[in-house]
């Protein structure tokens, strides 16, 4: 009886599949075999976990016997599966051949149904569009009411918060002025201190600057005293070139002198 039920199940499954399913019957049987082996492994694992919780002292011999029984059961299932493998493949091939005509009829009926439904697609689209338009007309007033309600709520919120914003803006301006008033004395104090320190620095550096200026003027004068005789000597020898060199040196001297007097 169980074999007959399995055969009918496979027959019905094959009858509802397309042509490419002709080679799937053996694989379906293979899936059943794999599923049974996985189920046996899970049963063994669950039972083994339960056995492991038993006390080794009192149930040691029982645990060994039960573990051995589970191993034997799994091995028996594996052996039976391997022994039935050729028969499973043969049954799959026979079922595929036996149901070929049925599958062909099913595919023919499906194709006829598709041909009949194809012209109905436009009608179906029209009906769906009609229903969607009805839903839209029904929902549109509700959506407008919700939007208007939210707009009213936002306007009321704006009216409530606007005075608060203005008050905060006024407070910020007042706080800025207050902070500025508090900071200005500090800024003026720092500015006065810096001015005082700069004046002290200028006063301290003034003697050194005057001394440096005097030394530079003296050095330039010495250079001039040495250069003038040389230019006079070279004047007769070099002619116009010496005169130009003298003019350039005198101009340089005047520039340095003016800079020192500044």
UniProtKB/Swiss-Prot annotation:
Intracellular or extracellular location(s): Secreted
Spell out the protein name for this chain: Apolipoprotein A-I-2
What this protein is reported to do is described as: Participates in the reverse transport of cholesterol from tissues to the liver for excretion by promoting cholesterol efflux from tissues and by acting as a cofactor for the lecithin cholesterol acyltransferase (LCAT).
Q: Where do the segments described as 10 X approximate tandem repeats lie?
A: 64-262
Q: Which positions carry the signal peptide feature in this UniProt record?
A: 1-18
Molecular function terms from GO:
cholesterol transfer activity; phosphatidylcholine-sterol O-acyltransferase activator activity; phospholipid binding
Matches recorded under InterPro entries: ApoA_E, Apolipoprotein_A1/A4/E
Q: Which cysteines are joined by disulfide bonds?
A: none
Which organism was this protein described from? Answer: Oncorhynchus mykiss
Which UniProt keywords are listed? Cholesterol metabolism, HDL, Lipid metabolism, Lipid transport, Repeat, Secreted, Signal, Steroid metabolism, Sterol metabolism, Transport
Q: Where are the sequence repeats?
A: 64-85, 87-107, 108-118, 119-140, 141-162, 163-184, 185-206, 207-228, 229-239, 240-262
Q: Name one GO cellular component term.
A: very-low-density lipoprotein particle
Query: Where does this chain mainly localize?
Result: secreted
Residues covered by region (3 X approximate tandem repeats): 32-63
Give the matching PANTHER family.
APOLIPOPROTEIN, APOLIPOPROTEIN A-I
One of its GO biological process terms is: acylglycerol homeostasis
| Family, similarity comment | Belongs to the apolipoprotein A1/A4/E family.
